[in-house]
Amino acid sequence: MENISKEVESNDIKIDKFFEVAKVIIYSIIGIVVFFIPVTIDNQTKTILHHITYKLQVNYRGLLQLCTIVYITIGVIKSTLSKHKSNLKKIYSYFSIFSIFIVISIFYDKYSIVLLDDNISLILEETILNLITLLPLSAIFMPFILDFGLMDIVEAYCHKLMKKLFNLSGKSVLNIIMYIFNDCFCGYFMTNLLYKKGQIRQREACIILLNFSIASVSISNYIAEELNINKVNFFILSMFILILVNTILCRTYPINKKKKSYYIKTNYKESYFKSDKLINSINKHIQNKEDINIFKSMIKNFEESIHIIIRLIPNLVLIMYLGNIIINNINIIYDLKIVFSYILEILRFDNIDEISVFLVNGFFNDIIAIDLLKKNIGYTSKLLIGIICILKCTSITTNILYLETTNIPINKIEFLISYILRIILILLISYMIIYLYSIYTI
């Protein structure tokens, strides 16, 4: 009887393990397909997440616009009722009421109160609609990526390489790919989620936010088409320079001042397996897994994404509005571009004025900087601008804006320093590549 009982118990364990392994495989495939696999529907090739986003924006645009106004109103009310440490923040919170009228004007074109360029109005509208659709959708599906073993599998295969190159754990690869295949806000959400759950260190979160929040594939395609440059050369050069630049910047200020500790203490441990990586990583997940209800996890992520949107939209609208005034002021742009003009002159680049103005505008917003760029410049200058646009990783309307909603300790000065160092490195490496190419072709 004892033998029969043990045999039954053993069979039960095997069946339970089979179902756990099946869950890891099925949920991981769902996550990969939703976030990372391009699918062609209606002659458009994009990820399933982007297809759903597109359908929502086309079929329910009016509802999304109404939701935006509700979100921004809630955000403004919360901001004005909050206790602010400084009078400046208090004044800004009252000024944020103006953002409601700006959005209504953009959506319904009924008021002449908004003095925005048509281009910037269009960019702002598309940014807001993408934010309120793509971010909640990605938040809903995020548990398939984070909670059911895919992170452990990726870490097992990529940990050694990522640690040597960038001082990152192997699981960071998934977060970086999230930026590339979706958009920066989805990437920021995932970075902060990993940090809050105690799965990446403070330093790793800062590295990803400052050095790997690169432009998505769709934005990169847009840049290549707008600048009329060869996409293959453009992407290969960009990835090569990205690896070189990040290998250096992941070991310099402000990254080297960040802690190696986790946000919270958990049982999670990084692991690297020399053999049987797939089997060992799945076993590791099964042994350390928490009892997670996927539907509760989806709802929790969705709620968090809505709270983020409510905080982001009023600030995004005001920053775009004020930024429009600044970038149209020739004197301000002239004063700011001097720093970059000096570096470009030393390296003897062509089209110095155009590139330096782009670098100033790019710190505000990539798409606006590309739209304002004079396109009658040399091919090398266009290629350089495109590479910078993909790799610079910092702008006021993206990660600096999003920082207010995260637990990641990076201040605005560190963002600015990181941006300047990054631009200088990209320019130096680009100069060396151009110089070596010119010698080779002689």
Protein language model annotation of sequence segments:
Residues 26-31, 200-224, 243-245, 366-442:
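C-terminal transmembrane helix pair
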Residues 77-85, 104-119, 148:
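Transmembrane alpha-helix boundary signature
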Residues 25-39, 64-79, 96-109, 135-143, ...:
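Hydrophobic core segments of alpha-helical transmembrane domains in multi-pass membrane transport
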Residues 156-183, 259-296, 342-351:
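Juxtamembrane inter-helical linkers in multi-pass membrane proteins
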Residues 287-377:
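Transmembrane helical segments that form the transport core of multi-pass membrane transport proteins
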Residues 1-28, 256-305:
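Intrinsically disordered, low-complexity non-transmembrane regions of multi-pass membrane transporters
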Residues 145-213, 371-380:
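Hydrophobic transmembrane alpha-helices that form the pore/transport pathway of multi-pass ion
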Residues 134-147, 164-187, 319, 341-373:
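Hydrophobic alpha-helical transmembrane segments of multi-pass integral membrane proteins
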